[in-house]
Amino acid sequence: MNRYKNGKIFSLFLMCGILGACDKFEAIPLEYKSTPLEEAQEEVLNTIDPAWELELMETNGYVMAFKDKKYDKLFTRTLGWNGGDGVLTTLLPDGNAFWSFNDSFYGVVEGETRARKDCSFPRNSIMVQTPGDEEENLVWLADFVQTTTPEAPRYYQARTHIRHPKASLSDDKIQEGEIDQDWLYWAGDATVCNNKLQVLWNGVDNTNPDALMRHEGICLATYSLEGTPGDDNYMKLISADHHFNDVDIYGYGSTLWEDEDGHIYLYGSYNNYDMIVARTARHDLTSPWEYYVGDEQGNFSWQNTYPTEEEVKRSRIQETDCSMPWVFKKGDTYYMLAQAKWFGREMYIFRSDKPYGPFVDCKRLFGFSDFLDKLGDQTYQNLYMINLHPHLSRNGEL
């Protein structure tokens, strides 16, 4: 599996197909607004500012999907970060946006051919975007090996942002620019509490060549938001609790939803395609967690103990196999956006009357092309980690 293909950032407009609420696993029939389809599509097209550089990708009834070519260009880079996966974002109180990345390329790319030269491969990295969508709005918070001498080795290469305590490389090797490969962290979701950024980092064990990328444990890192980007204190790592949740193997908090009921809902998965959920006691990731678990009769309840595998097998919260769930709310209804299984090239949308499901009435929202807008071979292998960035919305779109 080639996990290092560059992804795209898509802008998805939800037009006038309004989804209703649901009760348990019985979905109430949908009632659509009477706006004629062509009129509704034209209305959306008329709201698009040409400066956004949106390119129509697919029309699916009242849903229109666009490629965001402006963000494609923004992340088509020749120096420093020039590709990666993960790519989660969190809106900060000052209007800036926190970006986390997993496996990334740092170094130099030839501008005309897009060929990578000498690049390093840090396993996680972070960035802050100030309001705006220009190059100067991207403040990269990487620990660069050296940025002064283009002819010298490791020019604009970077170190991994946060290391796993079990990683085996010596400090001298890290200073030289070497990257840990045995134990590492990949980003989970993040939130703000008491004007500090809380980020979940999922532990990854690569020590067994027959079972690579095994999830083990969660680290909770806390960052300062004092000052402005570029200040010494802004995004300074205050603490990293490497033993925050040593027993986690299902990635609770890979994505999250902060609800008005006072809880943070933390979504994970069993067997990649069974979505499961936990929640915090308060809007604070350090508050106690409880897990939503189904019994043998199919009745769900919240429990304080981490679920066993048998319990998790009974605790799926959605009706159709999918991956990487993103929950949001519109009106009185919660929606879950997720990717079809087996690296599927379709996106699904579900609905529920609760942030913990059940999420039902699965519908195909849109599909991805089999080709990328790039030089050379435009086909690609696996499509994964399709993430929702609600604060990038310009006009109410997803």
Predicted regions and their residues:
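Repeat-based blade/solenoid architectures
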Residues: 319-321, 380-383
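Beta-propeller and closely related beta-sheet repeat lectin domains
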Residues: 85-88, 158-159, 186-191, 252-256, ...
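Beta-rich carbohydrate-recognition and catalytic domains
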Residues: 25, 29-32, 36-80, 92-183, ...
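Bacterial N-terminal signal peptides that target proteins for export
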Residues: 2-10
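C-terminal motif of bacterial Sec signal peptides marking the signal peptidase cleavage site
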Residues: 20-21
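Sec-dependent N-terminal signal peptides
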Residues: 9-17
